[in-house]
């Protein structure tokens, strides 16, 4: 897909449960055996046999399978990308704050509690700039999955209509666009961009004409910021690892002068910059020093040494000329007078992490984006409100409450979060001892089970998040954890190829082991319970579809016994009702997750390319048509419908995001 993706668990897997092998076309080899009553598809060369229910008559394998009428509309994005991006939080005159997560740019009106979304990108957004008109916005993205459209580029769009106005740089940028800035004086006709190629190429564009004016190699080292001077359109400043460069753009060329540190310590990283009202440049660095570079000068005219303990990740000049600085290590926000005297100090909360970026709000208020993917609003009084907070590492665990408007997510960051559908807020957030992989609510809605990456699993009280019980099965992650519909059994499907079965008493407060289902030759990827709570079906990493008796933990073989089982849920990727979900050229690992809607009309799937697709259920013809929706940038790890099938929640793996959609 154009860029190496490294697994968070080491190795260069695609950051997910499955290793990629040579591709094999799933759909084109499908066959139908009328006598035996099965459809056979091939995944990576392996036959997968799907038995038809006995009441299916006149089955035609070549019949068209139309897409459903239902579509998805994005309602809410949980999360903000502060962990590895910077300068990515702005306040618009509409009262909306604008920032990004995954492939979505979010315009969030805090007062009215609503979000709008710019959906033009097809992979991770890495950079953003707001035009001097405060309406036009430029956003830059990484190299994507799609060979044709997936090249890194910049999209320029209206924050009022959300229409795309211009697309620039397709085929020019390398890897990703990491920094953007509009010119300020000449009504913002120019746009500067830095990419993540080895040379970190700086380019200058006439964005309305979609024309490049000039470009140059800026630095072998990472570039962390790029800004036009607000009083001089012929000057651009870039800074990063071990450097600050002052660029002159006169005559359509980019000419570089490096900043000279003279008697001052040259820091390992220049981290942040801002401009004062008189045109001086202020920089913050990894040593915690603030340097002031006189207007039009490449030498330090003044220094504030030890302004922070550790790096200064952000600088922001307020409307009255005072300066805010935000610290990484010390988590402090410091207010400085216009002549660099320390005026006030406050600290952001420990739980939300260090300052990544600062943005001025109304009056004396300001917004803080943090390295733990949170956004806060507050003032120097230290009274901070958390507006956005979600996960900070890869995310797989998702469960929807059976009766109330709540859902739960859990991830490798060890956080378990219970969310409110309507309010888009956290009911509680519990920090566990191990990374979390999976979750499932007891049908009573009073208890939720969490599967860990360590082989442990726990049961928590839904109301309070308090721990009821801890169990250990094997030493590997528990990929799925699911209660039977009657609440009397719990199945724990593990990466060690086993499914552990427990009997459940006292609505999920007491557990005793029944046994384990042994028979898979690879790790278990999906499980579903039968409607009568007596049987299970399971998928594995090498495309086995097996059936089990819950009471005895014995495998059920023979198509007659299994073809007519009614399943309480359908979340697997193998079987007759889903044999058409595999796209042309699929290798069997592309689809990570499925969910049948409560009304049984549609099936949602989440794939490796950030797409959520809706199919008409059952998806019983190869190459079925579907409606697909983008928003996630990494593999979609989980999808789930609420009880009345009006909403869908999706989680992205490495994009760390969680999205709430309306089914329309």
UniProtKB/Swiss-Prot annotation:
Its main location: cytoplasm. It comes from the Eukaryota. WD repeats lie at residues 120-167, 172-215, 218-257, 265-303, 307-346, 390-429, 473-512, 519-558, 631-663. InterPro entries: Beta-prop_EML-like_2nd (IPR055442), Beta-prop_EML_1st (IPR055439), HELP (IPR005108), Quino_amine_DH_bsu (IPR011044), Quinoprotein_ADH-like_sf (IPR011047), WD40/YVTN_repeat-like_dom_sf (IPR015943), WD40_rpt (IPR001680), WD_repeat_EMAP (IPR050630). GO terms for cellular component: cytoplasm; microtubule; mitotic spindle. Pfam families: Beta-prop_EML, Beta-prop_EML_2, HELP. PROSITE patterns: WD_REPEATS_2 (PS50082), WD_REPEATS_REGION (PS50294). GO terms for biological process: microtubule cytoskeleton organization. Keywords: Cytoplasm, Cytoskeleton, Microtubule, Repeat, WD repeat. Residues 1-31 are annotated as: Disordered. It is found in: Cytoplasm, Cytoskeleton. SMART domains: WD40. GO terms for molecular function: microtubule binding. Belongs to the WD repeat EMAP family. May modify the assembly dynamics of microtubules, such that microtubules are slightly longer, but more dynamic. This is 77 kDa echinoderm microtubule-associated protein. It comes from Lytechinus variegatus. The lineage of its organism: Eukaryota, Metazoa, Echinodermata, Eleutherozoa, Echinozoa. The gene is EMAP.
């Amino acid at each position: 897909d154009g860029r190496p993706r490294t697994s968070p668990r080491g190795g260069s897997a695609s950051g997910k449960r499955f290793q990629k092998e040579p591709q094999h076309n799933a759909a084109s080899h499908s066959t139908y055996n009328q006598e035996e009553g099965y459809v056979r598809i091939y995944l990576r060369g392996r036959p997968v046999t799907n038995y038809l229910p006995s009441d299916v008559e006149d089955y035609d394998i070549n019949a068209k399978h139309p897409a459903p009428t239902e579509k998805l509309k994005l309602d809410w994005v949980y999360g903000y990308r502060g962990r590895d991006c910077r300068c990515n939080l702005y306040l618009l005159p509409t009262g909306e704050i604008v920032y990004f997560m995954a492939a979505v740019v979010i315009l969030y009106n805090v007062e009215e509690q609503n979000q709008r979304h710019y959906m033009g990108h097809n992979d991770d957004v890495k950079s953003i700039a707001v035009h001097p008109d405060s309406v036009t916005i430029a956003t830059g993205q990484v190299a994507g999955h799609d060979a044709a459209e997936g090249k890194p580029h910049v999209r320029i769009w209206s924050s009022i209509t959300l229409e795309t106005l211009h697309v620039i740089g397709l085929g020019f940028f390398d890897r990703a666009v990491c920094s953007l800035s509009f010119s300020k004086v000449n009504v913002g006709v120019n746009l500067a961009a830095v990419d993540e190629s080895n040379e970190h190429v700086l380019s200058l564009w006439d964005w309305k004409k979609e024309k490049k004016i000039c470009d140059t190699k800026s630095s072998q080292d990472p570039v962390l910021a790029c800004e036009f001077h607000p009083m001089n359109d012929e000057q651009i400043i870039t800074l990063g690892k071990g450097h600050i460069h002052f660029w002159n753009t006169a005559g359509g060329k980019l000419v570089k002068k490096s900043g000279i540190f003279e008697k001052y310590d040259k820091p390992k990283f220049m981290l942040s910059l801002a401009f004062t009202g008189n045109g001086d440049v202020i920089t913050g660095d990894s040593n915690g020093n603030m340097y002031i570079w006189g207007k039009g000068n490449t030498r330090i005219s003044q220094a504030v040494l030890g302004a922070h303990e550790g790096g200064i990740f952000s600088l922001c000049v307020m409307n009255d000329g005072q300066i805010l600085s935000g610290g990484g290590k010390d988590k402090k926000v410091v207010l400085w007078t216009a002549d660099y005297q320390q005026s006030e100090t406050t600290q952001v909360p420990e739980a939300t992490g260090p300052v990544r970026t600062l943005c001025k709000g109304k009056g004396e208020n300001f917004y803080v984006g943090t390295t733990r993917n949170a956004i806060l609003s507050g003032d120097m009084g230290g009274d901070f409100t958390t507006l956005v907070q979600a996960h900070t590492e890869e995310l797989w665990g998702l469960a929807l409450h059976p009766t109330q408007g709540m859902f739960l997510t859990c991830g490798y960051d060890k956080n378990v979060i219970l969310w409110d559908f309507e309010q888009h807020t956290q009911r509680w957030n519990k920090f566990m001892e191990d990374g979390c992989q999976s979750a499932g609510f007891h049908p009573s809605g009073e208890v939720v089970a969490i599967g860990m990456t360590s082989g442990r699993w726990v049961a928590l009280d839904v109301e309070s998040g308090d721990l009821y019980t801890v169990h250990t099965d094997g030493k590997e992650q528990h990929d799925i954890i699911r209660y039977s519909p009657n609440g009397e059994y719990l199945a724990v499907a593990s990466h060690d190829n086993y499914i552990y079965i427990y009997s459940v008493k006292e609505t999920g407060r007491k557990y005793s082991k029944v046994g384990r289902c042994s028979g898979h030759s690879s790790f278990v990827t999906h499980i579903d319970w039968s409607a009568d709570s007596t049987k299970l079906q399971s998928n594995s990493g090498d495309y086995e579809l097996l059936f089990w008796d819950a009471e005895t933990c014995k495998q059920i073989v023979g198509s007659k016994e299994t073809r007519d089982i009614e399943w309480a849920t359908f979340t697997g990727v193998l079987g007759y009702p889903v044999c058409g979900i595999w796209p042309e050229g699929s290798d069997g690992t592309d689809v990570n997750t499925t969910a049948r809607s409560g009304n049984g009309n549609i099936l949602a799937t989440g794939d490796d390319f950030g797409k959520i697709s809706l199919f008409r259920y059952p998806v019983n013809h190869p190459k079925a048509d579907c409606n697909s929706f983008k928003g996630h940038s990494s593999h979609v790890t989980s999808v789930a419908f609420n009880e009345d099938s009006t909403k869908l929640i999706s989680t992205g793996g490495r994009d760390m995001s969680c999205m709430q959609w309306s089914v329309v």
